[in-house]
Design a protein with these regions (language model features):
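Phosphate-binding/switch region of NTP-binding enzymes
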Residues: 145-197
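A conserved helix-loop-beta module that forms one wall/lid of the active-site cleft
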Residues: 282-347, 352-372
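C-terminal regions of RecA-like/P-loop NTPase motor modules
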Residues: 2, 184-221
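Conserved inter-motif catalytic segment of the P-loop NTP-binding fold
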Residues: 51-114
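Substrate-engagement module of ASCE P-loop NTPases
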Residues: 115-116, 121-148
Length: 857
């Protein structure tokens, strides 16, 4: 059969008038009611049966069936899910399986609004389905209801389909006016036609009397100009707002607003509905670009603020009001469809191309183009913020839910927001594309795969937040920022209470509080003893202080990481006194040499000494933990004035997974000393366990130190290769590395991503004083949260009393199989892969007694 071959519609006169429906045609019927669609669908089905065509009816709507049951028609029921991607892919797979020359009928596309709440996604469904049907030489009939969709939505359908036919009826006649007939033309084709259902006559209207009657019918269905541009999403919200303004019951409307805009997580839905007022929903909609969900991060931020407002109004008075915008999840799919990326998106979902297509897809996401309509909405955000910096943050549908934090898996991008409007728009668009592309990062894909989320819709909504802070010269930053944990079982001092909560506090932007930065340490604060520190001398406090500050450089159009002396001169004296401490020992040493020099370091002492502020942050977290019925972590900023006033900006809140130990490990008491490879105390983080180790991967500290700097990342890649080799093979592996794992600085340790180490049972960081490598767990960092969620044991080998025994030379007794993973002779000298599977090598961790032993049996 040749493509574009004429077929019979069951109405011969219509075939003549339209020069026939052809193979490949998608025929959209815009009707006032579905009975009008049946007038044309029934003859089409009857004719297809006569012609021995294969006929498929896609049934997904709640309306009465459009096709009667008969053996010649295959009815395929597809549950109408709120998950656009799942629904669309299911239909595509069926179409692909059915193959060429199939005749289709679809339920009413207008019904898709009940699941997706927006014209945008209905249009996206049609725009990806219609071309696919066209390539298979099918014929498909689709009804849509007149007046249900905006002009923009219908225009997208019109631009995609081959035929769009408008049907009108009165008591006497049925009228058809073609709006589009692709690749066909005649003198009368686009005139209104009268269809006589009894005789099958289909004639163009040529006389004035009939034309007058047609336009009388047409006039009944006209909408005002404003209504034509209003889609179902806006109509719903406008109706809900009208009910609210007229003091009518809005309970049902609020439930719907929560379900279609806020979250799909049932626990979070319950809390949102409990704490949100109708005005809260309207405020979200008023600050929203596009449609769909605002995502987990945005929902958590808004919910936490509503909880504080409702249950702690005194604290709410010091909360900085948010002025965020939300880019809805539908914009993500629309961007993919607009740029022709849908095919690669569908392929990437499949098991065989899940990882292999990710990089190509990410590159496409970075290089796509936004529609003019979307750009105009982005300009609204730029006009609102003026030239103040803002940040574009991921807020995916699955992110920050119960059990799925996605900590550090997706990008956040700061925008300095300076320059011409065109330059600022380009910077904003590039930031959005970068976050979109991060959904295809190896770490994100691996995280979703390990947690069974790889088949779920992961639409990327965005949270756009003005950077909270002040200007210090050309630098812009908050006075302080941090992450907080309502519960932290990992004590940096023996006497602190895990239930009191803990902070990682930094000066400047909060990125330094969640990343492992070279030689820089955030201030750890236990909220029962805020001023307590594990350092006993000023020299130690200085050594283990925050060395680098991050701020938005408005002149350089970037985020800049600076040493303290680069920004200290811009700080007003009152703020310097709050954030900085004097190193009196160092100053005295200089004076003894005749030098009068002020030596200060970041300690945030003025903040942790503020008892009211510390109590309020603690109260916020305990309040949220009580409402969530689960530990939480928050992100926040603190800004302070010279008068002593301050404001807290609550930027994020999500459920926090913590280890809940299931029992005491059985560590034998009679282990011979010569059998012990490692024994330490008070150095581990993770559940109690007794596990037989199959492989031990050791990065030799001295060999790694002597390795050229530019080659060090190859060690991380090799570890990743080992991880991926054993992925899903139920191997218990131990990784031993010098310094910090997951650091961005190779001179501090091995710069792996979490995806590189996700298959390991345990991670061991090794101190090596000669090379300057120091373990550092980084409580609260993204790598910390990854280890907790994956239940990977962390331990450290310190050169102090915590390490009772460490005999790495014993590992040489096992076969080194590194050659299975690399032929690089230099890497073979640095990385060793010891196969312990044929002999018994046991790892025991006793969380209760804080003791770990790795030994040979």
């Amino acid at each position: 059969m040749a493509a574009f071959e004429r077929i019979c519609s069951g109405i011969p006169d219509m075939d003549q008038a339209l020069d026939n429906i052809r193979l490949g045609d998608n025929v959209v019927w815009r009707v006032s009611n579905l009975q009008e669609f049946r007038y044309f669908c029934e003859p089409y089905i009857e004719q297809a049966i006569k012609d021995n065509r294969r006929i498929v009816y896609f049934r997904f709507a709640s309306h009465e069936p459009l096709v009667k049951e008969c053996p010649q028609v295959e009815r395929i029921e597809i549950p109408l899910s709120h998950r656009f991607e799942d629904f669309t892919v299911k239909i595509h797979k069926i179409i692909e399986k059915e193959g060429f020359d199939v005749f289709y009928v679809f339920d009413c596309l207008s019904e898709l609004q009940t699941a997706w709440a927006t014209d945008l996604m209905m249009g996206n469904f049609f725009r990806v389905t219609c071309p696919f049907l066209f390539t298979l030489d099918t014929v498909a009939f689709f009804p849509i209801i007149r007046g249900k969709h905006s002009f923009h939505a219908v225009k997208k359908i019109l631009n995609t389909t081959q035929l769009l036919l408008d049907v009108y009826s009165d008591r006497r006649n049925t009228y058809v006016r073609p709006a589009k007939v692709w690749n066909r033309d005649s003198e009368t084709m686009f005139r209104p036609h009268i269809y006589n259902r009894e005789t099958g006559a289909f004639r163009p209207i040529l006389d004035g009397v009939q034309s007058s009657r047609f336009y009388q019918v047409l006039d009944k269905f006209q909408r005002t100009g404003e209504e034509q541009f209003t889609d179902s999403w806006n109509r719903f919200f406008n109706t809900a707002k009208m009910l609210y303004d007229n003091h009518m019951n809005t309970d049902d409307a609020c439930n719907t607003m929560c379900n279609i805009m806020m979250t799909r997580d049932e626990k979070l839905r319950f809390m949102v509905k409990k704490h949100f007022t109708p005005q809260d929903y309207f405020n979200v909609r008023n600050h929203m670009i596009g449609t769909g969900m605002i995502g987990g991060k945005a929902c958590g931020m808004l919910l936490s603020r509503a909880i504080v407002r409702n249950l702690a109004p005194d604290i709410d008075e010091v909360l900085e009001p948010h002025d965020s915008f939300f880019i809805g999840s539908d914009v993500y799919y629309t961007y993919i469809v607009d740029n022709g990326f849908w095919d690669i998106r569908v392929r990437q979902r499949e098991e065989e191309e899940y990882f292999s297509l990710a990089e190509e897809f990410a590159q496409k996401l970075k290089n796509g183009v936004f529609s003019e309509e979307m750009q105009n909405q982005f300009l609204h955000i730029l006009e609102y913020y003026g030239q103040d910096p803002f940040i574009v943050r991921s807020s995916s549908i699955l992110e920050d839910g119960f059990g799925n934090a996605f900590a550090g898996k997706y990008e956040s991008v700061f925008c300095a927001n300076r320059g011409t409007l065109e330059e600022r728009l380009l910077e904003f668009e590039n930031a959005i594309k970068t976050v979109y592309a991060s959904s295809m990062s190896l770490s994100a894909l691996d995280y979703r795969k390990r947690r069974g989320l790889d088949k779920r819709d992961e639409q990327m909504a965005l949270l756009v937040q003005r950077v909270s802070g002040s200007y210090y010269g050309s630098y812009y930053m908050p006075c302080a920022a941090g992450v907080g944990y309502s519960y932290s079982p990992y004590k940096f001092l023996e006497q602190i209470d895990p239930k009191a909560g803990m902070l990682r506090l930094v000066m400047g932007l909060g990125t330094a509080a969640v990343d492992r930065t070279e030689g820089s340490y955030p201030r750890l604060v236990s909220l029962d003893m805020p001023q307590a520190t594990s350092c006993t001398t000023i020299a130690e406090k200085h050594q283990f202080s925050q060395r680098k500050v991050e701020a938005v450089d408005t002149s350089g159009h970037c985020v800049r990481q600076m040493y303290l002396d680069q920004i200290e001169g811009f700080l007003p004296e009152y703020l310097a006194n709050i954030l900085l401490d004097h190193d009196f020992d160092a100053e005295r040493s200089f004076r003894e040499r005749g030098i009068n020099r002020s030596v200060r370091f970041i300690a945030c002492s003025g903040i942790v000494k503020n008892q009211i502020l510390m109590k309020q942050i603690q109260d916020i977290m305990q309040l949220l933990q009580k409402e969530y019925e689960y530990p939480v972590d928050i992100e926040f900023t603190v800004n302070l004035s010279e008068t002593g006033e301050y404001s807290i900006n609550l930027l994020q809140c999500r459920p926090l997974k913590v280890f809940k130990d299931i029992g005491k490990a059985q560590i034998p008491e009679d282990i011979a000393e010569e059998k012990i490879i490692l024994e330490n105390v008070h150095s581990s983080m993770g559940l109690s366990r007794n596990v037989k180790i199959d492989h031990i991967v050791l990065v030799d500290p001295i060999a790694y130190y002597n390795m050229p700097y530019v080659r060090k990342p190859n060690v991380a890649k090799l570890i990743g290769t080992i991880t991926w080799k054993y992925k899903g093979k139920n191997k218990h592996m131990l990784l031993m590395v010098p310094g910090r794992i997951g650091t961005s600085s190779p001179e501090l340790g091995v710069p792996t991503t979490f995806a590189d180490i996700s298959e390991f049972e345990a991670i061991c960081e090794i101190e090596e004083k000669k090379a300057g490598y120091n373990p550092e767990l980084s409580y609260g960092s993204h790598i910390f949260q990854d280890l907790v969620e994956a239940e990977i044991l962390y331990t450290a080998v310190f050169a102090n009393e915590k390490t009772l025994r460490f005999a790495p030379e014993k590992l040489a007794e096992y076969p080194d199989i590194v050659s299975l993973f690399t032929e690089d002779p230099e890497l073979k000298q640095v990385v060793h892969v010891y196969d312990t599977s044929k002999v018994s090598c046991e790892l025991c961790n006793d969380l209760q007694n804080e003791r770990l032993v790795l030994y040979q049996q």
